[in-house]
Structure formats: structure tokens, C-alpha cells
UniProtKB/Swiss-Prot annotation:
CDD domains: KH-I_IGF2BP3_rpt1, KH-I_IGF2BP3_rpt3, RRM1_IGF2BP3, RRM2_IGF2BP3. The modification Phosphothreonine is found at residue 528. Keywords: Cytoplasm, Isopeptide bond, mRNA transport, Nucleus, Phosphoprotein, Repeat, RNA-binding, Translation regulation, Transport, Ubl conjugation. This is Insulin-like growth factor 2 mRNA-binding protein 3. Its main location: nucleus. Residues 177-187 have a biased composition (Low complexity). One of its GO terms (molecular function) is mRNA 5'-UTR binding. The gene is IGF2BP3. Belongs to the RRM IMP/VICKZ family. Residues 2-75, 81-156 form the RRM domain. One of its GO terms (cellular component) is cytoplasmic stress granule. GO terms for biological process: anatomical structure morphogenesis; CRD-mediated mRNA stabilization; mRNA transport; negative regulation of translation; nervous system development; regulation of cytokine production; translation. It is found in: Nucleus; Cytoplasm; Cytoplasm, P-body; Cytoplasm, Stress granule.
Amino acid sequence: MNKLYIGNLSENAAPSDLESIFKDAKIPVSGPFLVKTGYAFVDCPDESWALKAIEALSGKIELHGKPIEVEHSVPKRQRIRKLQIRNIPPHLQWEVLDSLLVQYGVVESCEQVNTDSETAVVNVTYSSKDQARQALDKLNGFQLENFTLKVAYIPDEMAAQQNPLQQPRGRRGLGQRGSSRQGSPGSVSKQKPCDLPLRLLVPTQFVGAIIGKEGATIRNITKQTQSKIDVHRKENAGAAEKSITILSTPEGTSAACKSILEIMHKEAQDIKFTEEIPLKILAHNNFVGRLIGKEGRNLKKIEQDTDTKITISPLQELTLYNPERTITVKGNVETCAKAEEEIMKKIRESYENDIASMNLQAHLIPGLNLNALGLFPPTSGMPPPTSGPPSAMTPPYPQFEQSETETVHLFIPALSVGAIIGKQGQHIKQLSRFAGASIKIAPAEAPDAKVRMVIITGPPEAQFKAQGRIYGKIKEENFVSPKEEVKLEAHIRVPSFAAGRVIGKGGKTVNELQNLSSAEVVVPRDQTPDENDQVVVKITGHFYACQVAQRKIQEILTQVKQHQQQKALQSGPPQSRRK
């Protein structure tokens, strides 16, 4: 994406005019300006320079009295599903952006782009061409917190190479936000092992010492520890701290971290730097609750075992631009290195548990794209579910055949109600918009009630999104112990005449349903039907188990309704003849 389109040019525009504009803006080009009538093309050295040119010049520079337009050059055949959204407010919460994007279709991926500007930039992939076109039309020029969004196509090479019959359906079989297809129909895809990197924050003044003369020091650390180390020194120009990403085995990562700590402490002595140099680890918020532990027990134990003092940045600092929390460890080199081992051990454990949970039962919901639902940290690099070879015809969401509104009563820990509602109701409002569902929390049945009922009303896809986010929030906020799965109870109401079909002869159907979903499914006996002649089915289990059970029960109900309709049609003609 380093080729630029320059539009709104006057007929008198010459290559020398454009050369002068780019030179004044200190933006290099890697080839001549190809000037046509009213527009031109040019290549930048790389994608980051192209983005800088767009942000610095588009709509801000005039040539012969006309403001020039600068965008990525995208051939028509590649203007399909991918958009770049620029000028996003820097402090915007992820969920606000999510809720805005999903208004126009299914978001397969949403990836933040590193940029030097104060505002944020994301690349978004929708599941179809029509959805992307609608998002472009509606969001370009959209006012968001006094910022005007700028939206343009970026090349969609993958979709352009697909069979034309498949393109409009937007079904690519993606298993991960932003990942490419892992194979073709009939092929066997091998899942690449995925490691969780260690991310550090270091004072900018020590970056030179860490890299060393001509990169010698960092190369030496990389070689000795068998690590891949990226020092992000060009990002966030002028920032007091820079991030470092280390990817290796747990042992290699810890060794590299300790080497970097030793270099910083030595450099501090050499330059007579008197301030304390803590170890700062960046971790996605989804893992932090489990690192802290119930009542802070996990963190206290690490502090005691390593003789360090550990603090974590507040939730309020999380923004679209910064989805990570900063874990600050104070101590000497040895104690900080030990603390890093224990902290990352806990974070990796949470990460692996989440992956296992994501993969568990995922094959029972075909084409499930978990990350597009925002149920997993977009920065964590979660691998796709191991559900066999993906198909190009597989949709990115569960294929919900019916769009009828359903009502589910989900019972959550009473202590988690505040987290679900959020400050001044912001979280539950955003969740409702994101899922496209009505979400209400019923009053407590008693002052000392341990659970509260959440009433979720919406079609199947909205149920999936809303329930998934609620499960995730309870896990994230540490309302269950770190090694436990979140298991909630859900109630759905079914017509009393259909309850027998859910149970099956001798309980056969309900037993098969429990074996299939791993959820506990109970149809209480001797229930008195309510005023709508309905009875309750209770489902208890982790998120995927509950979802599979709910969908299977809805399938049974659909079959019962169809059977009734057929009987009514068959009995219709004789009744009319009798009249």
C-alpha cells in the first residue's frame, strides 16, 4: 500500500509542482510522479510513508487554488471489502468503535495501524462488498467527538483473487481477526504454534544503549537468547518511553528481559541517572484480572516470592489507542527478572486457557469467527479454532437460519452487576448497541440474592454477541477464580406442548443434547405453564456449551412448529368441505 493517488488537480499541474509539495512536507518518494489530467500517481518508499503523506497533505495543501486529495491508490478490482478509517479520536474506547462499525455489517477484522499522528487509524475488513460500500458512504465525513472521520478503500488482494461467484457472499472462512485463509476446501491446514510475546516499556534515553552501536548489542542479545526482539523506537515520536517486543520461548524471553534490565542499570550508572528504573510490562486488559487474582492474592504472592513491589495502571487509561495495562515492577535486576517470570507465567496460563476455551465446542458452530465478535483481545494473536479445513463458503458468523426474536434469561453473579452496567450505564448501552439486542437487568429477588437475572431480547446472532460479551466481562473482571471457566445458568421458555420433544423418549433427546454441548440441560418436571402456556428449560455451562444447547433447542422448536403447520394445512381442506 505504498502507491498513492493524488486527485483534484488542475489541468496545469506538473510533476515539478508535486515534487515541490512532497519535498516541503519532507515526504520521500521512490519514483517519478505520473501526472494525468486531473490526477496523478506516485510511489512512496513504504506503507508508513504513504500514510504520512495522506495525513499531512490530503485536503491540507492547495495547488493552483484547489486542495489536493491524497489517498491510497486502489485498482477498481481491489475496492471490495477493506477500508482504512483515519482521524479517529485518540481516547475513543474500543467498544464505541465496535458498535459504530457493526451498524453496517459483519466486521471480519479491525487492526490498528501505527502512526505518528495524534489520532488513531484502523484497517477494517467487512464480510461483503456491499457492507464495505455502505460503511464508506456513511462514515466518511462522520463527526465523532468533534473529529471528522476519513474513510477510503485499501487494496483487498485476497478477495480480488477469489472466484467471482464467492465474492458477493463475503465468505472467506476466516478463523481470526485479520488472518488470511489457512487453506482451501479439501486441504488439511496445520495450525502454526502461537506464542505470546513479552512487551516492555523502557525510558527513551536508554533505547540507544539497548540497541548498541550499529545494532551490535541487540543482535548479541537476540543471538544469545534465541529471541526475536523489536525495539519500536520510531513510534510515538517524542514519547518518554518506547515499547520493546520479545518473542521466544519462556526461558529465552526471560533471559532477554534480564539482559535489557542489566543494560539499562549499567547505562544509568554511566550517565549518573539517579531515578529508579522499574521493569514495565505491557499486558492486555483481558489477562490482568486473572493476574491480580481474587482479592489481589496472586499479585501479593508474586510480590512476596520475588521481594518486589508491583502496581498496575488503572482501567481508566484504556483507550482505542492503548488497549494494554502497564504492570510496573520495582526492585533490583534479579528480583525484577524473577517477577517477570512469574507474571508472564500467569499471563501465558490465562492465554492458553482462553485459547482452549475458544477452540472447545467451536466446531459445533460452523464458520464461527470468534474475534470478529470482539470476545478475545485483538492484539493477542489467537489462532483459529482447530475445526478442520476451512471452506471458502463458510460464513464468518454462525449461520443462524431464523431471525426470530428470542428472549433468554441469563443469571450472573450479583457482584458483577456493576461491571456489566458500567459507569452511568455506559457499558451496558455500548453492549446493547454492539449486539443489536435489548439488555435489561431485573431487580434483585431478595436483598442478599447471590445472582441477578439479565434479560436479553434479540435474534440469534444478537444473543450470541451479547451473551459472549457478558461471559467475557465476568472472566475479565475476575468474578471467578483464574483457573475456573465461567459457567452461567440460562433460562429459555418453550411451549408446554414442545417440552416433551426437548426431553425425548426416556430422556434420550436431552441426554444427547448434554453429551453434544457439554452443558447441563434440565426441564423441571411438574412445572405449571405460565399465562402463555410456556415452561422453562434451564441450561448451565460455559459460553460455547450454552450456545450449542440453545441453538439445538431452537432447532427442535422450529421442527415442532413446522410439523404443526403441516398438520394444520393437511386438516384445512376437509374442514372447508364440511362447511
